Amino acid sequence: MKVGFIGLGNVGGKLAGSLLRNRIDLTVLDRNAQVMADFAARGAGIAENAAALMRECDVVITCLPSPAISAAIMDEMLPEVGPGKTWLEMSTTDEAEIRRLAALVEQKGGTAVDCPVSGGCHRADTGNISIFAGCDRQTFERVLPLLTRLGRRVLHTGAVGTASTLKVMTNYLATANLLTCCEALVTMKAAGMDLATTYEAMKISSGTSFVHETESQLILNGSRDVSFTMDLILKDLGLFQTIAERNNVPLEMSPMIIDIMKDGQSRYGERANTDDIIRRLEEATGLSILAEGFPAELIDDEPEEPGYEVFPPGRARPVAAE
């Protein structure tokens, strides 16, 4: 199987690295020539353009920063789509747009899967990231061996579009967690508590979360370098808000979270790291939310292990259609 990968950014580059590490025949494409040269030095092929990549590969994976960019890339690839071609969309994108693009692929005889990832760049780097996959069951069974080279836990979410719907929900939850962690840390500092002790108390309590156990460390170190930027999270929050509005759900926290992140973006820059949002409260209180003993970057300390499918509670393994 020949695999193409478009988009070698913070997440995409690490996912593509997992394919190389697992000896997949890989060809890459990115607008950054130096990044492509680095992949070539590691054994990857280099594509001239998206159309050539689709023409030469059995599977093409995209991991891009916005729905508009994904659509533009698909416009280039579509003339080369046909029977035997598979498109895996690993970008965080709009569920209606992924269904539209998937329909175009299917009209040409190809197959499409929306399969965004979750778990952070550090887990993408080690192949331990989680993957949601939206497609019919037969297609899922066919692409599962490739997905388990990219990540550890793979969840079949249903039809095309369901994975993207769930993905933006998880990013909404992660942002809500981040903001509450920021408020908790600043309040404890103001109350005279030691921040390292505060971190540990949160970690071993009912108030812990994946975001706390990862991003709070970067906040306390001072690097705030989570490799995820405010423009990207605002895109994802907007997609989640759109889903709620489309389904007549009167959200209260979501608009507030969007306003806070927009304010952070206006203060610190469009592509500031999301963890820089702590600075709003540091500036408001005059407090420094720093502590010794925390890392500047996240390292996944779990060893890479073979990926596998996970199932919702009470669900048995389905049988693929004949």
Set out the residue ranges of the language-model regions.
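NAD(P)+-binding Rossmann beta1-loop-alpha1 motif at the extreme N-terminus of oxidoreductases
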Residues: 1-63, 85
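Hydrophobic residues within alpha-helices
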Residues: 15-16, 101, 146, 187
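Hydrophobic beta-strand scaffold residues
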Residues: 26, 46, 112-113, 154, ...
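Rossmann-fold NAD(P) dinucleotide-binding segment
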Residues: 50-111
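Rossmann-fold dinucleotide-binding core
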Residues: 92-172
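Helical "substrate-binding/catalytic lid" subdomain
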Residues: 162-284
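NAD(P)-dependent dehydrogenase/reductase Rossmann-like domain
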Residues: 266-322
